[in-house]
């Protein structure tokens, strides 16, 4: 149950740790998710083991219907003639999630393309002619244009002159001519095989003409369905179109919204380095020279209108995106996602804040780029990843990354290793580090405080939870799951079913509790995996696997981020604690179940402390400041300071509530920054109070006759303050040293301590005051530019526009490169006039409310000698004086009311007298 199962085996052969761990291992495969030492339920897979498509033993492309249609001559694909003569039914899930028959036959595939002048590693040879040996290379996912399965589906080809003002989906060079081809739609699906620009092609090894391979063409699919129907609608991916379909051991997804090219490239560079590392492990039984064939990188962008143009240009530079071929509709169906596939051999590098093309990469990388038509949030992106693409590829391990998170050079391998070592590992995560830019960002106290918080979580929280086998949250920014552990049972219930409920929990019919809970849906997924019926999956923390990410450096951004985190984690924790009994439906041992119950009890105590955090902090503040008012400490000075700070404390607390209930953090930044500075002052005063009270208590003990060191521990003040706080801080330091990671104690400890009141008061108040806000902090969908449609013609064909000319392809490629060739313009946050005016009105309202509340509070405090004013007068007459002031106040108020009533009565009588004489 250790937090790091890699230990010293890292660097050895991947399976040399224990031959007994995988008794069924064959064909150089990794441990199957269904191959633990003891069997577990296999029948809970919703798709079920079904009849597989027959594959020949050779590397020839199987005689199978495919949804690909020909884009150019030589393209791979079938036509109607084949389907008419080869009737075949298709099960609901061709590549079933069946752990007992998991990819045994598809692990070692030769990679032997033609040697070119660009080559510096062995690539073998292609046949000289296209029809020779009938595509013996497994990398060629295509059929011949005129093959035994049917004739070329093209019937006509003609050219039209494109007008200069022709509509294109995004800025592109104006083409002089565009070739229009009639393309056959199969089952209503449009799939195009698009040649890449010669400028790009000449940089990488590829098949010599007329040969074609995964390096010469990019594959585009216009998905017109929901992710859950992707397979049933007969869409597929390149990896399944080879003669011997490639097995996907690692399926890596990078989700993004509108991240810029720098953040995206930073993540992609880290992923590429990990793939290079796995290809360099030549002694491994799973990885090695051709390891890249077992790894697929999927980039999913949330909304065509939202993607950053510079980021899209980087994808085009890699060859995985081309402008101008996407369609809005196919045969009257709206396109829901544009799917681009290409195996890139282009590397990226960062120079300062600029992305540059490095040239040829060390190893190829199989990439899928899914550009969703609409902005439907991150959870929908994960639906495309798991339900659509995952169902087709049937991977072993899925790795989740956010754009901007940079994995370490071998971090993904180390995550995979955790699954390899522990067959029952259902999920794992690494250490999330704050990106500090060589320490420069530590000058920002907010960044330093978050750095300490992250470190403390990775040193104490996650290792402890990993020891029990249940980590409350595997961060979506960098985590991994075993695909089979996520699958639903035969009734459609399970981890993925519960996880994707969150997509439906943002409408009018969603309960507010459930909607808030699904702001942290990754916590729900973790709980469902560990408590999965008749299974015994565990979650693990892998400290040796790291990922770096940026954190908010502005208070407004920080508050908005933590609002979602705090609300989601709180309600998800309530859900987990309330459903702790579901642990009994799992197949864990009795000892493990007991350990998990202990962890749930620990989380309950943590949740209670979070619930009472504001009250606990105020009580500690009040008790310490009251101590300072004693005669043997600060005396009158302590009393005055205590009352002043208490009034300011309560005033700031009320201000937090008023702002949280109606103001946007970005529009009230001055208010919030003022409060942060005040809370820092409060923490400094509290630290001074702790030290001063402790020193005075020690001096008092020392001055007594017969003093011994043990007498200090009999002093309640010393024992309460020093022993409790000291043990906490010393424990942090010792744990950091044990984990060989102590530097944050020297660089970030003070900043974290000073920001503690801000964490407790500002963040918690804003979060709980905005439980009605169940958004992810992103704006609504912008209107995307309309794309051309592919309309059905007689004969089941559509017209598609194709840039045929090499000059056009090169010009388009140069245009994309130019988009990120220059340094990005400095991002300036533009606030609209409507937002500015709304912020002004809300700020004025908040100021009026605060002035009204504070004046009434001050009146009550003065009359009743409350809120600390009674500390100034310690005489015995204090009670009598207070009663006298109350009596006088009551008399003033009541007689004032009576006087006002008399005044109004006299005025009313005078009105009647005047009216009587006027007669009106």
From Swiss-Prot:
Entry similarity comment: Belongs to the chitin synthase family. Class I subfamily.
Cellular localization per UniProt: Cell membrane
Stated name of the protein: Chitin synthase C
Record organism: Aspergillus oryzae (strain ATCC 42149 / RIB 40)
Residue positions with a glycan: 715
Entry annotated with the keyword Glycoprotein: yes
Gene Ontology MF terms: chitin synthase activity
Catalytic reactions of this protein: [(1->4)-N-acetyl-beta-D-glucosaminyl](n) + UDP-N-acetyl-alpha-D-glucosamine = [(1->4)-N-acetyl-beta-D-glucosaminyl](n+1) + UDP + H(+)
Sequence segments annotated as region (Disordered): 1-41, 140-173
Keyword annotations of the record: Cell membrane, Cell wall biogenesis/degradation, Glycoprotein, Glycosyltransferase, Membrane, Transferase, Transmembrane, Transmembrane helix
Gene name per UniProt: chsC
